C-alpha cells in the first residue's frame, strides 16, 4: 500500500496550476489571513474547473492559462490583444475572471475551513455538526457569499458574450 507523507501532499498541492493565489483569495474575500494557504489550493482548482472553465470553454481557458504561465504568473504582463492573432485582451479577461474565481474559491474553501471530518465523524467549529444553530449559520454565510460570487460570475458571462467574437474559442 502506497502512503503519502504530509510533505508529499503539500508538495503536490503546491504544484497544481491556479490562476490566483491563496493570498489573493484572503485579500479579496472574508477568508481570514490565518487560514493555511495549503488548505485553499484545492478549493481554487475546484472553483476554476466548476465555475470559470465552463464559461470560458476549454480553448479560451487553456489560452489564458498558457499566456499566464508565459508571463510568469504576472497578470500585468498578459497580452492586451493588439499583438495576437486571436485579438483577445487576456489582461482584461484575467481581470474579469479574478473576482468570480476568488469568491467561488472562498465558497469552496468554507467547507474545508468550517468542517472537520475525521474518525470521530463530522465536526462543525469544534462541536457536533448536527447542532442546528451552527449549521444554519454556516448556510447563511454560504448563501451570502454565493450571491456575491454569482454577481461577479454574471459580469464575467456578459463580458465573454460581448467581447469574444470567435465562438470557436469558447469550445
PLM features: residue spans?
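Catalytic-loop motifs flanking and including active-site residues across diverse enzymes
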Residues: 101
Amino acid at each position: 500500500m502506497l502512503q503519502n507523507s504530509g510533505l508529499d501532499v503539500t508538495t503536490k498541492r503546491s504544484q497544481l496550476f491556479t490562476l490566483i493565489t491563496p493570498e489573493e483569495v484572503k485579500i479579496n474575500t472574508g477568508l481570514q489571513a490565518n487560514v493555511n494557504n495549503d488548505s485553499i489550493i484545492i478549493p481554487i482548482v475546484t472553483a476554476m474547473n466548476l465555475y470559470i472553465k465552463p464559461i470560458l470553454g476549454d480553448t479560451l481557458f487553456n489560452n489564458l492559462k498558457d499566456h499566464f504561465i508565459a508571463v510568469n504568473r504576472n497578470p500585468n504582463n498578459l497580452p492586451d490583444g493588439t499583438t495576437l492573432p486571436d485579438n483577445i485582451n487576456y489582461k482584461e479577461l484575467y481581470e474579469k475572471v479574478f473576482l468570480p474565481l476568488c469568491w467561488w474559491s472562498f465558497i469552496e474553501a468554507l467547507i474545508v475551513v468550517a468542517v472537520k471530518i475525521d474518525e470521530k465523524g463530522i465536526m462543525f467549529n469544534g462541536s457536533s455538526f448536527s447542532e442546528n444553530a451552527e449549521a444554519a449559520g454556516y448556510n447563511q454565510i454560504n448563501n451570502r457569499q454565493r450571491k456575491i460570487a454569482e454577481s461577479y460570475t454574471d459580469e464575467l458571462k456578459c463580458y465573454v458574450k460581448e467581447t469574444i467574437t470567435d465562438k470557436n474559442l469558447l469550445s
